[in-house]
């Protein structure tokens, strides 16, 4: 049985979808699960035992042509994708992105069973024949609900009659399409995101950190600067206050991409000038190198951005700062975490990329003291567990 799992981008979204892919693979271990993904994100799926084959596709290139209405190029790209996917003879396609572009990917597969999210926009619903219903849950649970349509879809499909799907105890859930969880699975077991770091990558990260910091008894705090939305970011001066307030007892690693390397130049110059215990990795890591360094951190502090979800997937304790996005939908769901919001604001979760108030007070109003207190609390919890 060949399954195509569709979640093309981005970091957090792909990681949120890994629980659904694992759910499918654990219940259909003989199936071959392929995942189609934007090439720059493929690193996130490497060494994942629940993904048999990664199929890179230039989603960003297609979207760029779409915005300019380059219809001929779009058609050629889709036709090339169809020719690439057809030899796999997919039995099932699972779309947890719910966009027109992912609907077109489903169409290109020719799969008779096509699962997707309910209530989607951009005509995505035209391309799926089994749809989930509940869109009010955490996004991980939304994706799982799509995956959990599979037993029913298989039973109702002519695939079963053609004998192309095995119906052994391992493959179908005791022939009960309504059974979606195993009795031995906890909430965290089901909803945990997956990101796998190799032993070699982990050893390299630990060696790198040991070489940088002289005081190896101090905890290492990962701080993820910036976000894809300006409204989700915590101001630079707040990060500075946090670092200064804890520099006597902690080492810090700063994470971010090329954008953050530019945006936080002044902060990095300041911590270097003051000789604060900060390791600047802004714009200097691949996704996998970042993952290995995050895994070596004792606590990670972040706004709602990709590296936050990487840390959660790696089961690191996190302090998550939320403003315009809703943590009940996008925040930590498993592991050891604290979520901080500025509850003085009545517009939390507005999902606006530009604040109509002129400044994102939901984020700038988060006090570094609150963050420090939550970091210390998590460090104490981790310390007590070690003892």
What are these regions (language model features)?
Residues 1-387:
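Catalytic machinery of carbohydrate-active enzymes
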């Amino acid at each position: 049985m060949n399954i195509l799992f569709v979640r093309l981008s981005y970091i957090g979204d792909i990681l949120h979808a890994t629980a659904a892919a694992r759910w499918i693979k654990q219940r259909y271990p003989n199936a071959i699960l392929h995942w189609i993904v934007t090439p720059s994100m493929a690193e996130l799926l490497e060494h994942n035992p629940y993904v048999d084959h990664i199929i890179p596709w230039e989603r960003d290139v297609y979207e760029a042509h779409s915005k300019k209405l380059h219809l001929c190029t779009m058609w050629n790209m889709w036709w090339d994708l169809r020719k690439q996917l057809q030899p796999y003879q997919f039995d099932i396609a699972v779309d947890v992105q719910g966009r027109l572009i992912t609907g077109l990917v489903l169409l290109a597969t020719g799969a008779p069973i096509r699962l997707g999210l309910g209530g989607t926009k951009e005509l995505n619903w035209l391309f799926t024949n089994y749809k989930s219903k509940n869109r009010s849950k955490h996004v991980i649970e939304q994706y799982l609900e799509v995956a959990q349509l599979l037993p029913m879809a298989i039973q109702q499909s002519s695939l079963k009659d053609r004998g192309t799907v095995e119906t052994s105890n391992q493959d179908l859930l005791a022939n009960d399409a309504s059974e979606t969880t195993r009795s031995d699975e906890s909430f965290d077991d089901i909803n945990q995101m997956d990101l796998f770091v190799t032993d070699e990558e982990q050893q390299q990260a630990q060696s790198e950190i040991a070489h940088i910091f002289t005081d190896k008894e101090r905890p290492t705090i990962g701080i993820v600067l910036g976000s894809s939305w300006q409204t989700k970011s915590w101001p630079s001066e707040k990060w500075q206050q946090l670092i200064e307030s804890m520099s006597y007892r902690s080492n810090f690693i700063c994470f971010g991409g090329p954008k953050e390397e530019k945006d936080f130049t002044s902060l990095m110059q300041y911590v270097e000038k003051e000789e604060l215990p900060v390791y600047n990795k802004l714009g200097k890591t691949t996704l996998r190198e970042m993952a290995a360094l995050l895994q070596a951190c004792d606590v990670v502090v972040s706004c709602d951005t990709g590296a936050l979800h990487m840390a959660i997937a790696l089961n690191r304790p996190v302090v998550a700062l939320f403003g315009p996005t809703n943590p009940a939908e996008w925040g930590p769901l498993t592991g050891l975490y604290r979520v901080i919001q500025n509850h003085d604001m009545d517009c939390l979760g507005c999902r606006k990329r530009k604040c109509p108030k002129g400044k994102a007070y939901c984020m700038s109003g988060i006090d570094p003291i609150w963050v420090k207190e939550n970091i210390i609390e998590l460090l104490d919890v981790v310390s007590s567990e070690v003892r």
